[in-house]
């Protein structure tokens, strides 16, 4: 359903944000 698609998109966005956060922390 649409909700599942939205959840997948949100998860993808969260993963991208998480990766960016980890990268920034690693840079410090």
UniProtKB/Swiss-Prot annotation:
The tissues in which it is expressed are: Expressed by the venom gland.
Q: Which InterPro entries match?
A: Cupiennin
Record-listed Glutamic acid 1-amide modification sites: 28
An annotated GO cellular component of this protein is: extracellular region
Report the record's disulfide bonds: none
Location, primary (coarse class): secreted
Name the source's superkingdom. Eukaryota
Q: Which UniProt keywords are given for this protein, alphabetically ordered?
A: Amidation, Secreted, Toxin
Citing just one GO molecular function, the answer is: toxin activity
Quote the subcellular location field of this record: Secreted
Give yes or no: UniProt keyword Chaperone.
no
Whether Amino-acid biosynthesis counts among this entry's keywords is no
Which Pfam families does the record cross-reference, listed alphabetically? Cu (PF17563)
What GO terms describe the biological role, i.e. biological process, of this protein? Answer: defense response to bacterium
- Family membership: Belongs to the cationic peptide 04 (cupiennin) family. 01 subfamily.
- Protein name, please? Short cationic peptide-1b
